[in-house]
Amino acid sequence: MKNVIEDEILPDSANDIKVEGFAIQSEEILDKTSGHWDHYRENMFPAMEMEGESYVLRPMNCPHHMMIYANRPHSYRDLPMRIGEIAHDFRYESSGTLKGIERGRHFCQNDAHLFCTPEQIKSEVADVCNLIFETYKDFKITDYRCVLSLRDPADKKKYHDDDAMWNHAENALREVLTELGIHFTEEIGEAAFYGPKLDVNVKPAVGAEYTLSTCQLDFCLPAKFHLTYVDKDGSEKTPVVLHRAILGSLDRFMAYLIEETKGKFPTWLAPVQVKVLPVSEKTLEYAESITEKLVEAGVRVALDDDNQKIGYKIRAAQQVDRVPYMLVLGAKEAEAGNLSVRDRKGETTTMEVDEFIAKVTEEIKTRAYNN
């Protein structure tokens, strides 16, 4: 299911540069430069010594994407530049906060950093918000609220100490969200250590509200890494960075989906979309031919060729695996060359093979929620 989300919901077109195969550890100096070492060390795993160098498991991807940008000179014509990846991150969360795949010490997140000019902030924030809310439509997420997360000015230890930068960043993000017509509340002390952020919080079926998506405005890290671009007048300027996470931790998002759907995923998202159930060995050959046709059509299909009674196979597929569609194939179906289609509700319909394939592929294409 994670692969489906990555391939279908988080398209490469949202990024100019897609990072793959990045090391899960980095030199300690990167986190010291970014400020993570000073402001986030209690949530990081201890440093490791290897061949005379000190490395840490990366808790975030910001420093690495900064270094990709810094790898070559840039002009204002190059901006906005979007660097994204499906990243493996590691955070030493306290044991009391751990909660299955919803909150662990190792997780995958869809993460991107958008490098832009100050004039491009509004359009980039708008694009991020549109991408977030369009993605929510795909998953039928309607119960959410937007929060402008600000720093606590009195907490100098938690936040980068630059009042002018913070005032500028908070006012800029507040102004953009207001202009975009996004209704939001403000919460003090919830910002990232380097800048304010828009948090989109959801209320899961079980448990407390949590942040699913973020868009963070950052004037701090580009300056710390001495990032520049050449402007129209030939002068060097520092870019602004937006930290974008459309679905945040994919592990947490899968936990959210499991709770919301009770494991009954829509056809387009289900790990197995169709399960083929031959009644006996006599219809196994026909079942195999149907399975091949579904595979050729791009359907995720599984063939249950175990020597079990058909009632057992149906219960396992419907109640345990919660597969959207089951094809019960007996002698009657094999002789007629058609299908007995059973859905999760237990309703059974006789359909032609091509008719069923067209139905399933249309549900996948349109991301329908009708089963």
Model-derived regions: residue spans:
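NTP/phosphate- and nucleic-acid-binding module
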Residues: 1-371
